[in-house]
Amino acid sequence: ITAIEQYKVVFLLRKGSYYDVYRVVDNKDGKYFLKLINLAKLDELQFNPATDQICEIEMKREISHPNIMRQIDSGEAIIDGQRYAYSVSDFIPGELLSENISRKGGCSIYDMKHIVTGLLNALKYLHSQKEPIIFNGISPNRIMLNLSSGTPIPLLMDFDHARKLNKVNLKCYMKGLSPFYLA
């Protein structure tokens, strides 16, 4: 059994231009999110030239913070003759901030205070790394809310536009970014 075969797809959550995100379970019935990335569709700026690894997966391997979605597994697989990378994250019982705002018609000041505080803590953590990480592209579609407790806990996700500040090539992958959310 290959590493990716331990995960069984429950359903597709969303499709991107070069990736699909699935809800999966493992052999022990653990629930996870699996991001399957088509390597042929990536831009060269999404790879670390020194390691030939996808920057997003490489960065998430190095970080751990309560307001950042945790990557628990990653690797590569050949599926139907195509090369893919995958990143597995903990399943979060909740929804995207954008979905939450749409469903509720807004967000209370009380909830927003906790969301913003959590995001600022995550950004402070990223910026304080030995090689500071610039997230780029913070938007309501890249913030997952854990709704398992009374107060929503925000988690930054989708590091596809993130980069290390000390990286020799300071260009970043801009496709799909909104100028309103660049940071």
Q: What spans do the regions from the language model cover?
A:
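AlphaC helix of the protein kinase catalytic domain
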Residues: 97-107
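Activation segment signature within eukaryotic-like protein kinase domains
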Residues: 115-116
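AlphaC helix of the eukaryotic protein kinase fold
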Residues: 44-62
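Conserved short submotifs of the Hanks-type protein kinase catalytic core
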Residues: 80-96
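Conserved activation segment of eukaryotic-like protein kinases, specifically the C-terminal portion
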Residues: 171-182
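ATP-binding glycine-rich loop module of kinase domains
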Residues: 27-50
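Catalytic-loop of the protein kinase fold
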Residues: 127-146
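Conserved HxN/HPN-centered segment at the entrance to the catalytic loop
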Residues: 64-74
